[in-house]
Structures are given as structure tokens and as C-alpha cells.
Amino acid sequence: MKKSGGALRAGVIGVGIGSHHMRGYASHPRCELVAVCDLNVDRAKALAEKYGATYVFRDYRQLVSMDELDIVSVATPNYLHARMTIAALRAGKDVLCEKPMATRLGDAEAMVAEARKAKKRLMIDMSYRFNPLQQEMRRRIQRGELGEV
């Protein structure tokens, strides 16, 4: 469900590194930060107020079950990525998951399988790949300028 004007309605699980996701959603003209979730509810409430989120949860299952969300960011400790991502996908949400994708290959494969089954987008936040320096290094490697890598 998109809000009027077509903006994406986002929820963020984990407000440590997830605070960067919150800032991004809150500042983007086509996004609205709706909900945040963290075990540290006081910190979650403070950041929700700072970035304009309406809902604060301690349990990620409450956040992913919200009909008001289109996308969920998973920015929790690595061992929780698969569990929380799969729950969000099963709830019909697109997911942006922090790196690493998972701590075990089987978990990563299950995440991809669930995204395909749900016909939802799953993206792993490998933001350095968009960094101009990283892109230039990739081009040089592809041209063989740096020898065998």
C-alpha cells in the first residue's frame, strides 16, 4: 500500500546502523518513514521522533505485519538477518537488508527463495558498489590494468 503521491512507506528494524536508513527514508521525497523497531525502545522512540516515524515496536513481528508498510529495512546483528528478512517477505514487504546477507549459505539461499516465492524485492545493502572510487577500481580490474586479481 503506497501513500498518496506514490511514496514508499518504510519500516526499519534495528536503530543502530538502521539510523542511517531512517535518515535516508525520512529525507527522500518519495518515502515516508512509518515505523521503527529495536530492543532498546527508548532509543527507538527518540529516533522515531527525530525522523518522524509514527510507530515504535520492540518486536519485529509487529512491524512486519503492518499493512501500512511497503518496504522494511533489516539492520540488526548479522545472525538475525535471515529470520527477520524472511518474516518481512512472507508478510508481503520488499526488503533492504544490511550486509552481510546471512551468516550461513543455507540462510542466504532461503532468503532468495522466499523473495522469489513472495514475488518481492530483496536487496542487500552493499552501498560501496555505488562509490565512484569502487566503480573506477572495478573498471581498471576489468581492463587488466592491475594485473591478476
Residue ranges of each PLM-predicted region?
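A contiguous active-site-proximal alpha/beta segment in oxidoreductase catalytic domains
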Residues: 102-149
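Beta-loop-alpha module in the N-terminal Rossmann-like domain of NAD(P)-dependent dehydrogenases
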Residues: 54-114
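Short, well-ordered coil/turn segments that N-cap beta-strands
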Residues: 8, 31, 54, 70, ...
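N-terminal Rossmann-like dinucleotide-binding module
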Residues: 1-51
